[in-house]
Amino acid sequence: MTTKKQFNSFEEMLSGSDVPVLVDFYADWCGPCQMMVPILEKVNTQLKDRLRIVKIDTEKYAALASQYQISALPTLVLFKQGQPVNRIEGVLQADQLIQHLQSLL
């Protein structure tokens, strides 16, 4: 899907992106989160020039999850110019998610 990159901060990565960033807040133990993997791969394939997808493990980055008030998994947050503009909790089918995101890009 995407390559892992190191950033000094999450905010730096968001503000440095020239396209909107869809952040997938997940946990390895979360079954619905695992269901999102192929869905996000399809989204990435169809919207790769218009969107960047980043996965954040809420177990490793609990402070980020808390900062963005993540209380359910999976939660997708769309950021534009470093600011959260849309939030989706739970699993959506790829076509539904793509249609929803296209209306926001």
Predicted regions and their residues:
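Proteins that catalyze or organize thiol-disulfide redox chemistry
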Residues: M1-L22, A27-R50, E59-A63, Q67, ...
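Cofactor-binding loops of NAD(P)H-dependent oxidoreductases
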Residues: I56
